């Protein structure tokens, strides 16, 4: 039987508050400045310095603006760092709008196919409700970007630059999702009436293509690649295709890269491969697949890759214990327990199980600091522009990484034979709403 909150209890709560006058100082500061500013720990800011024993040379940060394309920016940033070093470019970027266009069109097709597949289920079934919650969005996972690149390649930012809607995606997402839900109504009715759903879907996608062209521009089939390197030498290649550009200039075999996750919940054993039902963007594309490993294994692989001069795509819960102004992510950055007098002591597994934490954002690890043989902090390249953090870069303490990092993508050469074999086994399929199916925004 549930019990209501009584006035007697409220009086008791108020009395306990008045018995602690020292908290009036905290109250005044918090009410004027907010929780984070009032509880910021200066010791943490001093100890987390942006200096690293091992660091990959990078250029200025990119800016995803008001969009949820961090996973795309992070992956393309790992590619451009390699390309910039090889070709001697400065502040060169690959087109995030190009991959965004194909991602949205493919997600539309993926959604409509899933609507047709589930057309016999009730509208209020958990699966259909989950599909309709977000027909498509900006967010994604590493394997989704792999699917796009393998099918469409990449282009320089100059070949397909940003538009208003690529950087401020809310209106486009609203309109596209409204259209997709309308199409879902039509397709489900057509299925019930035994009409041609495939033909209807093709007509729908043709109109969605037009919507995307009008808001993002039409992707180039060929383009001219012309640039000056850091030595001011002019280089030129005419009429190259996006796939040829990737193979010739980026030249990374993405099949050699393995997504590692750290999900220490009871239902996910370590050294086991996982996938997520109904998660993806391209029908018959690269499936979402991870290998769940202990955090020490994940961090060692990332450290080794950085030491060898290659950056690392990683996914985390960026909003947890993170200070944007200085770009510090540390478990001690805010004195919350000391200020409020109670502890929030959930484990990483409990935060996943009880919906308090999950992968929300993707960035790039570009440096690591080793002191006395132990890693104590990491350099992080964000994609929020140069006005956030330290010219766009953040520093994460190793303790923060333990608690709030959920995924890295590393070359398989940094993993043992046993781990590679574990990844290659048949994955366990997770439900679509599992926290490890969350998308980086």
Curated annotation (Swiss-Prot):
Name of encoding gene: pepC
Protease keyword on record: yes
Superkingdom per UniProt: Bacteria
Cellular component terms per the entry's GO annotation: cytoplasm
Swiss-Prot/TrEMBL catalytic activity: Inactivates bleomycin B2 (a cytotoxic glycometallopeptide) by hydrolysis of a carboxyamide bond of beta-aminoalanine, but also shows general aminopeptidase activity. The specificity varies somewhat with source, but amino acid arylamides of Met, Leu and Ala are preferred
GO MF entry, a single one: cysteine-type aminopeptidase activity
Top-tier EC class: hydrolase
GO BP of this protein: homocysteine catabolic process; proteolysis; response to toxic substance
UniProt keyword terms in alphabetical order: Aminopeptidase, Hydrolase, Protease, Thiol protease
InterPro entries the record matches: Papain-like_cys_pep_sf (IPR038765), Pept_cys_AS (IPR000169), Pept_his_AS (IPR025660), Peptidase_C1B (IPR004134)
Record-given protein name: Aminopeptidase C
Pfam families referenced in this protein's UniProt entry, alphabetically: Peptidase_C1_2 (PF03051)
Family as reported in the entry's similarity comment: Belongs to the peptidase C1 family.
Lineage: Bacteria, Bacillati, Bacillota, Bacilli, Bacillales
Enzyme active site: 70, 361, 382
Organism from which the protein derives: Listeria monocytogenes serovar 1/2a (strain ATCC BAA-679 / EGD-e)
EC number, UniProt record: 3.4.22.40
């Amino acid at each position: 039987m549930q019990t209501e909150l009584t006035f007697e209890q409220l009086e008791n709560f108020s009395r306990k508050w008045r018995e602690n006058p020292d908290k009036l100082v905290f109250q005044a500061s918090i009410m004027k400045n907010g929780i984070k500013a009032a509880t910021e720990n200066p010791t943490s800011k001093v100890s987390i310095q942006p200096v690293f024993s091992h660091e990959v040379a990078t250029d200025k940060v990119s800016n995803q603006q008001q969009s949820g394309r961090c996973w795309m920016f992070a992956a393309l940033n790992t590619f451009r760092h390699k390309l910039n070093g090889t070709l001697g470019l400065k502040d060169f970027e690959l087109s995030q709008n190009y991959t965004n266009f194909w991602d949205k069109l493919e997600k539309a097709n993926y959604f409509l196919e899933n609507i047709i597949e589930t057309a016999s289920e009730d509208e209020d079934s958990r699966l259909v409700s989950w599909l309709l919650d977000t027909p498509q969005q900006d967010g994604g996972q590493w394997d989704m970007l792999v699917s796009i690149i393998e099918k469409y390649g990449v282009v320089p930012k100059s070949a397909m630059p940003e538009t208003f809607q690529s950087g401020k995606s809310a209106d486009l997402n609203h309109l596209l999702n409204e259209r997709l839900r309308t199409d879902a109504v039509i397709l489900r009715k057509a299925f019930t009436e035994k009409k041609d759903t495939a033909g209807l879907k093709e007509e729908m996608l043709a109109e969605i293509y037009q919507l995307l062209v009008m808001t993002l521009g039409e992707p180039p089939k060929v383009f001219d690649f012309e640039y000056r390197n850091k030595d001011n030498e002019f280089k030129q290649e005419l009429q190259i295709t996006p796939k040829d550009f990737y193979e010739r200039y980026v030249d990374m075999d993405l099949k050699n890269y393995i997504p590692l996750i750290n999900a220490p919940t009871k239902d996910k054993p370590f050294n086991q491969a996982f996938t997520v039902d109904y998660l993806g963007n391209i029908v018959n594309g690269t499936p979402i697949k991870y290998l769940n490993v202990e955090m020490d294994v994940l961090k060692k692989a990332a450290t080794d890759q950085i030491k060898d001069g290659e950056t690392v795509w990683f996914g985390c819960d960026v909003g947890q214990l993170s200070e944007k102004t200085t770009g510090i992510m540390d478990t001690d950055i805010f004195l919350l327990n000391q200020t409020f007098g109670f502890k929030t002591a959930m484990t990483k597994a409990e935060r996943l199980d009880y919906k308090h934490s999950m992968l929300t954002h993707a960035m790039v690890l570009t440096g690591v600091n080793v002191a006395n043989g132990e890693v104590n902090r990491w350099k992080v390249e964000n994609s929020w522009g140069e006005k956030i953090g330290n010219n766009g870069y953040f520093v994460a303490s190793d303790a923060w990484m333990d608690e709030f990092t959920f995924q890295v993508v590393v070359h398989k050469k940094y993993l043992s034979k046993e781990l590679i074999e574990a990844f290659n086994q048949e994955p366990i399929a997770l439900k679509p709403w599992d926290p490890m199916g969350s998308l980086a925004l």
